[in-house]
Amino acid sequence: MALWPSVFLLGLLPLLGRGADQIQTSSGKNTLEGQLWPESLKTFPFPCDPKTLAESVPSESVHSLRPSDIKFVAAIGNVETAPDSGADDLEEQDGTEKRPEQACMGVVTVLSDIIGRFSPSALMPLCPETRLVPRGGAEDLWMQATELVRSMRENPQLDFEHDWKLINVFFSNTSQCFPCPSAQQKGLVLGGMDKLTRTLDYLQQEVPKAFVNLVDLSELAAFSRWRQGAQLSPAAEPCRCLRETSQLTKVLTQWSYLEAWDSLLASSKYNTQESFAVVFQPFFYESSLSALLAEPPLQDPTTLALSLWNRMMEPIGRKEEPFSEKERKPLRCPTQESPYLFTYRNSGQLTRVSQPQGKLEVREGTEIRCPDKDPSDSVPTSVHRLKPADIKVIGAMGDSLTAGNGAGSQPGNILDVLTQYRGLSWSVGGDQNISTVTTLANILREFNPSLQGFSVGTGRETTSQAFFNQAVAGARADGLIPQAQRLVALMKNDTRINFQEDWKIITVFIGGNDLCDFCNDPVRYSPQNFTDNIGTALDILHAEIPRAFVNLVKVLEISKLRELYQETKVSCPRMILRSLCPCVLKFDDNSTEIASLIETIKEYQERTQQLIDSGRYDTRDDFTVVLQPFFEKVNMPKTQDGLPDNSFFAPDCFHFSSKAHAHAASALWNNMLEPVGQKTTHNDFEGAVNITCPNQVWPFLSTYKNSVQGFGTWLPCRDRSPSASPPTSVHALRPADIQVVAALGDSLTAGIGIGSKPNDLSDGTTQYRGLSYSSGGDGSLDNVTTLPNILRQFNSNLMGFAVGTGDASGTNAFFNQAVPGAKARDLMSQVQTLVQRMKDDHRVNFQEDWKVITVQIGASDLCDYCTDSNLYSAANFYDHLRDALDALHREVPRALVNLVDFMNPSVTRQVFLGNPDKCPVQQASALCNCVLSPRENSYELARLEALAQAYQSSLRELVESGRYDTREDFSVVLQPFFHSIQLPVLQDGRLDTSFFAPDCVHPNQKFHSQLSRALWRNMLEPLGGKTDALDLTAAITLTCPTQNEPFLRTFRNSDYTYPSRPAVENWGSDFLCTAWNASRGVPNSVHELQPGDIKVVAALGDSLTLAMGARPSNSSDPPMFWRGLSWSIGGDGALETHTTLPNILKKFNPSILGFSTGTLEGTMGLNVAVQGARAQDMPAQARDLVERMRNSPEIDLEKDWKLVTLFVGGNDLCHFCENPEGSSEGEYVQHIQQALDVLYEELPRTFVNVVEVMELAGLHQDQGGRCATLLAAQSHCTCFKYSQSSVEMQELKKVNWNLQSGLSRLSYSHQYVQREDFAVVVQPFFQNTLVPLNGRGDTDLTFFSDDCFHFSERGHAEMAIALWNNMLEPVGHKTTSNNFTYSRTKLKCPSPDSPYLYTLRNSRLLPDQAEADPTVLYWAVPVAAGAGLLIGILAMVAGRGMRCRPREDPPLSLSTGL
């Protein structure tokens, strides 16, 4: 790495810390005896025992000099910090002039203190004062030396001739641009030595008995904030190489620099005497750039002194351990074997390998004797059918192992490791041939001699010899991204290859350098970042390079390098090893750091596995990435003596030699031929190089898709031809005519869990769309059975299938728009997205291409139905599914829609609850609460099963309605294979979970394969003869179209008639609510009123409340009032046969009073409605009602809770048509308010429903036929004689809307919120009145009475349902349109969390009265509620595609679609 300035702001030499400030250059006592251990060392342990090492007689030779022999310590050379940039005033500048002396003294005092433990009589240390103006470099150093000698001579305590002295000479070589990469470090050292010679000569000549430490501070001086006065020459400008030098270059240069100094000094005149020696003490630093940027350097002189002392305790040749700014090493002690300070003479033979030894290692070749070396008969289009001889181009990305650093270096020639022997690189080198050099490229050249892209010779990645070997020495995972970009550009621009057509193999190997630095920056080198960087680089290759097979080699188990580092019997430059890979080598075996390293290696390997297993790079048929795991487990090769065999390594013992490159190449090749899941993960370097031949039966390079054969299926069909010309009818559609596939649905169709490994619950969110039974297109039918893969056997140009993994928005999804967790209500959104995608995709001819769309929904609805039984009711399920299919029918031409049943919840329960030891029972509520949580034989379970049956009935009813068979080019076919599933049972009687994902809820690939076969079989079976059961263990063969029946089956080509729907016997409803009880005590507040608390019902209104004409009558008879069937007050029969509001309330309180029965006035109960009544009649009806209640002996007026429904306005609108000038919207509201005032003043404990007037014109428009005549002839309502487009009708619509608007404001009137036991709530279900339609799209007259104006019994039932559901909806969120479609299950249930009838207050639109200002109430609440009302209207309009009438300018007509 480059020697950036910030890197070397280390903590060992900032000597102006607290210790330096306390040092005195003189004292009253000039010896260290009795002095306290210095402040900076008080807490530092002193482990040495001076008594065991002491000698009574001082040594006569410097080569046997013990610490106890030393009497005096001194130093020359400036060791100081630069003045602060902020020290501008003279006072501050004067302070800095003393810093050199203080800094020097800070170091030598600590050294003296250490020596004082061995030699109590040692004198106080000395740094000569410098009062002269510095002249720089060698001159200053010499002047300090002369001053030092003078001071020592004049010191009366020092016996200058006989006492041993320790002199430290601090210098730096910064002017020499140290340490720029150079193989000629000797020249640099000689230059430095020349500058030091005068000083060293002087000391040797003048100072007897001296041990001189030559302390090199070059790295620090060059780039820190320190100002070194003892630089050997004036500072020069920093050289450019400092920014370009790699970590490897820096380390090797440090080593060679150290070796050069030692070699020079060992043979110099300074080490020939007995009384004088000079020893080079190096300081090379292990540093983390990120750490130094984050923290300021330590300001402690002790650090340098301790490190220098420890260096003195190391033999020459072993002073290799770099200094770490993060940790302070313990103080080292002299040993019994070596109790002296080390010199070049007493260190013995230098252990550092300094010169090349031996001859160039013999390179290992091999031979290939494969019988089949031929390419494919034609150039393959699929990467999964790629033979070795089909490869025409080779490339590689990575670090120095791929660059080939040191691969061809002679043993001992450490500096030559800087040479990148790319031609020998295991994955891409092409030197010579396979007989002499074993590399992947040379192996492939045996199959295709014309291979291009391999590297030859030596050089960096920028040289022409590198070709497509773009590995960069020192690269980490984040360096792969620029490498990928460079490789793509080179390939695109190289005229020797055909970029689009040539098949390429690219090998990616990275991670060693990331692991080596992991401990210094765990965030940068985290497993997540490592994988993300690899993913980004692979994304570039995937996006840019066609026809490519990418090898991603798992990261090397680099921790095994510790064996080589720790074995001292093996000659290796440990300084280099440790510097290159500190995080692997510098910690103890049982340390937490090593445990973390091993775990990180494992995570690197696992995350890369997950990245590739995701299918992210298997989205194209001409590209794949295959993980090659042969480096996952590596044993250190050993010699016959059992020692680590360094012949497999370059001279630095870190990089591979050509021998290791050969073994790696053969291991990679063999991995490439081994099936995924069966690849060798252990590489034995000690064995012979072995080259495997491709299997003659299966000669392809193994990929994820061609390695999995277990889920494939054989298609026996011989006739796979399309129609002679594209069919125009869906009933004449052959499989080969299908050009587009698509799918809608939930997690099953999205592919959740299909490809998950057993027991891997963490993979529960991956959407394996490429394996989805109805829309997946991964692999081929040979190994992945899906409907698209079957159809591709008939039409290889099929479009729309999903591949790989990802969500619905990704390109991999294509036309699989299923969304995990989707409910029926989400289908419409999926349809809209699908239609838009089809229209926008240029590959699809939207109008002409035939499409198969598979729809499956319902399971997720059942999973959540118990949370909101209203939202997930069968009626809503039917409506949502119908709306989605209607949209497909309306928008998509030439389509066959498969409507597939959902998996019965009983199946899920059996599997999940029957295997508690395998299934995550604790997660049942999260996975599918309403299906998995109910107990056996419980009411909740029975309700679930009933709802599931209702859902299934909805599927059949929709298809059999024939509404989707009105066009020749569109049909919906129910495929019932999922209706009944036979689960496999193991021999011990337990259910076989091998067909399910780890969550035991979703089917896995084994299950999906069976679903695909069953779906295909259903599509070829005629209606009326379709298989409606699935045996998961059955051998389902793929059937074929026959000559007589070559088409996909529809109702018409099956000669099938849908069964007629049974006649509806009554208009009752099924009651599915569970909480039927009233409140525990009679509530005092209307805002806590539950349905079971209601004791009395009553109604005000006109002939609609009287149920006039609800049942047919003789045309000659006057119309009858069927009060007992009235929607808001009728009580005939029971809810199961007659749906009315009182019959609903009877389910909660069978003793309810006030409802009407029959047709006579005597049984009218509290129904005070009057035929022809208008708003002006409401106050009188209110008074009549109050009087009847007072006079009823059954009613406790004060205590009984009452429910009053007021509905009027139709006659007011009719009156407007007769006399526009005589009608006023204000009067209408005023009359209603007067009636409410009466109720408010007279009735305690009352809940009032005010139902908004219906849209009169919209409800009766386009009735046609006899109704057109009857309505026009209405004498009491002349509105219908006008056309819908007339001015009169437009005015009527305005008035209609104004009446609704005025009425909605009543419930916010301040006077009706003052009492705790009274509430007025406007129920707006008629606000947007929708015309009910029949199956043909015409107005359904069965909702109307014989006069076409009033409602029939069916219409009354629908009004009752709408009113009840409105009452259970919060104010501001109420349904504002009627849904007049038949279903017995549309009634909502009170929510367990909020079981009350909704009022303004419990809808949280009204603050407590005690806290609210009435004036604020009156204005603020209507605004808030109005906004909520508007939102509700807009949501309804958007969801149903309806056009609602704006308040300002009503449209000419209403949409009549449901």
Swiss-Prot record:
Residues 1437-1458 are cytoplasmic. Sequence repeats lie at residues 39-347, 362-707, 708-1054, 1064-1403. Residues 39-1403 are annotated as: 4 X 308-326 AA approximate repeats. Residues 20-1415 are extracellular. Its main location: membrane. One of its GO terms (cellular component) is apical plasma membrane. Gene3D superfamilies: SGNH hydrolase. It is an enzyme of class 3 (hydrolase). The keyword Cell wall biogenesis/degradation does not apply. Pfam families: Lipase_GDSL (PF00657). InterPro entries: GDSL, Lipase_GDSL_AS, Phospholipase_B, PLB1, SGNH_hydro_sf. The active site is at S400, D514, H655. Undergoes proteolytic cleavage in the ileum. One of its GO terms (biological process) is phosphatidylcholine catabolic process. It is a single-pass type I membrane protein. Glycans are attached at N173, N433, N493, N529, N590, N690, N783, N1077, N1114, N1379. Its EC number is 3.1.1.5, 3.1.1.4, 3.1.1.3. It catalyses: a 1,2-diacyl-sn-glycero-3-phosphocholine + H2O = a 1-acyl-sn-glycero-3-phosphocholine + a fatty acid + H(+); a 1-O-alkyl-2-acyl-sn-glycero-3-phosphocholine + H2O = a 1-O-alkyl-sn-glycero-3-phosphocholine + a fatty acid + H(+); a 1-acyl-sn-glycero-3-phosphocholine + H2O = sn-glycerol 3-phosphocholine + a fatty acid + H(+); a triacylglycerol + H2O = a diacylglycerol + a fatty acid + H(+). Calcium-independent membrane-associated phospholipase that catalyzes complete diacylation of phospholipids by hydrolyzing both sn-1 and sn-2 fatty acyl chains attached to the glycerol backbone (phospholipase B activity). Has dual phospholipase and lysophospholipase activities toward diacylphospholipids. Preferentially cleaves sn-2 ester bonds over sn-1 bonds. Acts as a lipase toward glycerolipid substrates. Hydrolyzes fatty acyl chains of diacylglycerols with preference for the sn-2 position and of triacylglycerols with not positional selectivity. Belongs to the 'GDSL' lipolytic enzyme family. Phospholipase B1 subfamily. Repeat 2 contains the catalytic domain. PANTHER family: GH22081P-RELATED, PHOSPHOLIPASE B, PLB1. This is Phospholipase B1, membrane-associated. It comes from Oryctolagus cuniculus.
